[in-house]
Amino acid sequence: MLKNSLLLFMLAFVMSASAMAQNSQRTLAFEEVKAIAQAAEERAKKDNWNVVIAIVDAGGHLLYLQRMDGVQIASIEVAQKKAKAAALYKRPTKVFEDGLKSGNQGLMLLPGVIASEGGVPIVHDGQVIGAVGVSGVTSAEDGIIANSAIDALK
C-alpha cells in the first residue's frame, strides 16, 4: 500500500511539473530591461527630450522606472499606465489613440486603457513578455522613443 501511494505521489509530481513547464512563459531578463531602458534614454537624449521610461512584465507589473531631469511629475503615472495597457491589451497604445480620434468613444470604457501613443508591447516568438511606456513629450515623440527602445532587443 505504501509503495503504491509513493508511486502515485511521484507520478502526480512529475505530471504537475510537466504541466508547469508547458505553461511557462519567457520573461524579460534584467539585462534586457536595462538594454531597453538605455536605448530609450539614448533616443530621448538625441533630441533633448526629457521623459519618464517605464518597463513592465506581461502582467503589467513594474520592472523598471526612470525619470529624467525636468520631467513633470504626472508623467511618472502616465508612462506606467501606457506600459501596462500595452502589455495587458497586447497592442501599442497608439491603437487606442487612433481609435478615439476616429470617434470610437467606447474604447474609454475599457479598464486601464490610455489613449495616448507611447506604450509598446515587447513581443518574443509571438508572445507578449512585457511592455515599455514613455511619457514627457508629445505622444508621437513618446512613441518614437518607445519604439526605439523595443528595437534594442532585435
Q: Where do the PLM segments sit?
A:
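Bacterial N-terminal signal peptides
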Residues: S5-A17
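N-terminal secretory signal peptides that target proteins for export/translocation
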Residues: M1-L2
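Flexible, solvent-exposed loop/hinge segments and secondary-structure transition points
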Residues: M20-K154
